[in-house]
Amino acid sequence: MKGRSGVLTYDNWNVMHMALTADLNPFAPIEGGNQEKFRSVAKSIFGGAKLLTDDLVAMNTALINGEIDAYFTGGTYTASPARFDGATQVRAITPNSGPVDGKGGVVWVELTSVVNNPDPSSLGEDFLEFVQAPDISKAVAFTEGTYNPVSQMGDAAVMSLFDADELDAIQMDSLEEEMSRSLDYQVVTSYDALIDIYTQERRS
């Protein structure tokens, strides 16, 4: 892969995935020799990269044009725009195995909730009702720029609003399998030390 890969420079995500690549749990303390394992992986990934950018459109374009064969890291949220435009050869892939209970990916689920403020507004609950309506749920899933599954798709009234191309764009066919191979997002315990190492290797 040397010279045939890219790094999508979403640094916080890359720190987690580089830890997993180094056979480490990103959500447990990483110290001493394990930090050197992390450094070695960061050095290898950055050293072999042809392209570094924080522009997912540029990265997908390089993939489609054959300039690179893969990029580190991404997911449904980065692959879906290209897939929806017809480039279905672009696909987010979760490792088959990994160092934490056999899992090698990370997933996060965003929730909208009402916060228990001392002086709550009734508008919060109105908003929750609004965003869970089928048409708004669909609009949230396909907000321009990146497309993602939403939990409301468990409701048949929401799911029925998606056509086959939209479901294919967000890789609905493999969602359950990808989720089963992924850790839930947590706080990266040693983030300060790891981002420092990451930044050093990115600049070298």
Kindly label every feature range from the protein language model:
Residues L8, T21, V115:
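Residue-level recognition of the GNAT/N-acetyltransferase active site
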Residues A62, G66, P81-D85, N117, ...:
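Structured segments of extracytoplasmic/periplasmic soluble domains
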Residues V7-Y10, N14-M18, P26-T94:
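Ligand-binding pocket segment of bilobal, Venus flytrap-like solute-binding proteins
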Residues D23-I30, P118-G124:
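Short helix-loop capping/hinge motifs at secondary-structure junctions, enriched
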Residues T88-V106, V115-N117:
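Short beta-strand->loop
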Residues E110-E178:
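Mature extracytoplasmic/periplasmic domains
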Residues M1-V7:
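A conserved helix-loop-strand patch within extracytoplasmic ligand-binding domains
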Residues L167-S204:
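Conserved C-terminal helix/tail region of periplasmic/extracytoplasmic solute-binding proteins
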